[in-house]
Amino acid sequence: MAKEKKEKTPGYEEFHDALQSGTVGNVYIFHGEETYLMQQAVTELQARLVPAGFEEFNYHRLAGKGLTMQEVVEAAEAMPMMAERTLVTVEDMDLFRLDEAQRGALVALLGDFPEYCTLVFLYRQIPYKTDAKLKKLTAALAERAQVIEFAQQGQQKLQKWVRRRFAAAGKEIDAVTVDHLLFTCGSLMTGLVPEIAKIAAYARGPKIAMADIDAVADPVLDARVFDMTDAVAARDYDKAAECLAELLRMQEEPIRILAALGKTLRQLYTARLAIDGGKDVLWLKDLWRMKSDYPAKKLMQSARGVRRSWCREAVKRCQTLDHRMKSERNMDSEGELKLFLMELAGVK
């Protein structure tokens, strides 16, 4: 039980530091939403363990729904060729949902694991969920495997990383513009890599401007929904309707749009309460656990255009529509979403 209650799961930095010091584990479980860093860790393992030109013999990649534990065992037990160790990666095998025979095979492998092998279970598309009721498997993994969580990076690390990426492309970017990029494109490095490349290629000058980002970046859902809500608050229904139409053209599910809209409306409500109560941007940032004050500033600015009563009613109506979408059959969800937006624009 003590292992399940540890304060902090090791992340990329701990893994990287250990690898740099020469410490390589035998079994890893990689999980978390920052798949860019997860792949970076796999690349570092490959560079350390697998000699160039011998990947076919010493680096075994396994994946697929039909993958069996027997295949994993065979790959793990395969002897290295012209190298001291082998690397085996297994993608999206849900260890705690294996049948009893497969779990038994995994426990047996972990109990007598070849020292020359490093086995990595990669949770890319599925979440990593343990099950304490499976005591033998839980104990075997606790004894043999290292769990590494690749979580979203903090604001300071992202700022430095974004600047390095742009610098590699011969461009500069200031802190405020980085904040705008993260607000627009999200905070996951995996999604930021292609956006940074696209923006750097588009920008004509040596320094990236917000206009460069707005011109070519693909905003994440939350950013698009904020623009839609901001347009409603500014009484610009045409722009709000255009934002919604664009989301629907992109085949975003109405229920996902409504969920994001509900969150934005709640944030807008608290921003209005902050204004009425004499609270500042930092109060709002801390309340919503935002990484920077940039989105909080945008919310406060938008909230100045609406009344508290409007915010309260908007949140209530959103909750009602959410319940209806989830409970009523054959609902015209797109039509109801458009109608809801019109109602928001019509009541101030």
Predicted features and spans:
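Conserved beta/loop motifs at nucleotide-recognition and modification sites
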Residues: 1-348
